[in-house]
Design a protein with these regions (language model features):
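Alpha-helical transmembrane segments of multi-pass membrane transport proteins
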Residues: 1-303
Length: 303
């Protein structure tokens, strides 16, 4: 149960703001990042609620999977410790809001939000006495390296997409699927999601974006689907692929971090219920697109 909860819960990070995956998708798909972030909130909380409901029901039926903390141990936790734990989460939330909140409400641009977030984190580290010239130099070097990496990733994806556009690949695939094979647009969408599930077992989200996004996103738009909504579907499918046996990306990371007595088979068994739940969540977002589109439409208006 514990390994399943850790793996399933960790996948929610790429759905909720400030999701780097949605930022990359927005840049490659030329879609507004603010709307993508807001579109991920509804499905992200939906998956979280589905996880919680499953855990509560499962632990109620099998109490040994999640025994409650002993009364003696709970009494040892003072109100002062609870307040300190609560205060520890306020600063990270404030930093996150300084990046995402100001950008979503239109007070800052994406670049300005990044600078504000970096400045806020630096000030917090300085206030706690955890920063010096050596640390600052190391952070700047690593930040520059990551920024350059993402620049080349986006450049490669855009160049890849331009080549496909120039060759007419999107139109050719549309003709193949819709006219020669007689498929409906929804059939094409399901096939796309299945390819993401397959590739996600051995590739990360960035690699998949570079390989297929330049081809899939123009096709999605030509089929009449909302690219904002599709970005959320892409992220959910990545989440499922990461934890799908036998080659899920996160499964082997969990095996590397878990105690030796927890086998790979145990990890496989623990994650299967959560994979099923995430598939249910994906189907719900496909059938009811408003789960993803309602919030950005309320904030920014209909596109």
């Amino acid at each position: 149960m514990v390994t399943g909860v850790i793996q399933a819960g960790s996948t929610l990070g790429i759905m909720l703001p400030p999701s780097v995956v949605l930022v990359l998708y927005g840049m490659i798909a030329r879609q507004p990042v603010g709307q993508l972030w807001l579109a991920g909130v509804g499905p992200g909380f939906l998956l979280a609620v589905l996880f919680i409901v499953y855990i509560v029901i499962r632990c109620h039926l099998q109490p040994h999977l999640g025994p409650p903390l002993a009364l003696e141990e709970r009494q040892q936790i003072t109100w002062g410790e609870k307040v300190r734990l609560l205060r520890a989460g306020i600063i990270p939330l404030a930093i996150i809001f300084s990046m995402t909140g100001l950008f979503v409400i239109g007070a800052t641009s994406m670049v300005e939000s990044s600078a504000i977030g970096a400045l806020a984190a630096t000030l917090v580290a300085w206030g706690k006495g955890r920063i010096n010239i050596r640390v600052l130099n190391d952070v700047l070097r690593k930040s520059l390296g990551v920024s350059c990496m993402f620049m080349w990733i986006i450049l490669a994806a855009l160049a890849f997409g331009a080549v496909f556009d120039g060759l007419g690949a999107v139109h050719a695939i549309e003709v193949l699927f819709l006219e020669k094979w007689g498929l409906e647009p929804w059939h094409v969408l399901v096939l796309m999601q299945l390819t993401y599930l397959l590739m996600g077992t051995f590739l990360d989200d960035t690699a998949m974006l570079i390989i297929v996004a330049p081809l899939y996103i123009p096709l999605i738009i030509s089929l009449g689907f909302d690219p904002i909504w599709y970005g959320v579907l892409y992220v959910i499918t990545c989440q499922i692929a990461y934890i799908t046996p036998p080659f899920g990306y996160n499964l082997f990371l969990m095996r590397a971090m878990a105690p030796k007595e927890i086998t790979l088979l145990d990890i496989y068994k623990s994650i299967i219920p959560f994979v099923m739940i995430m598939i249910v969540g994906l189907v719900l977002v496909i059938v009811f697109p408003e789960i993803a589109t309602w919030l950005p439409e309320r904030v920014y208006g209909k596109r």
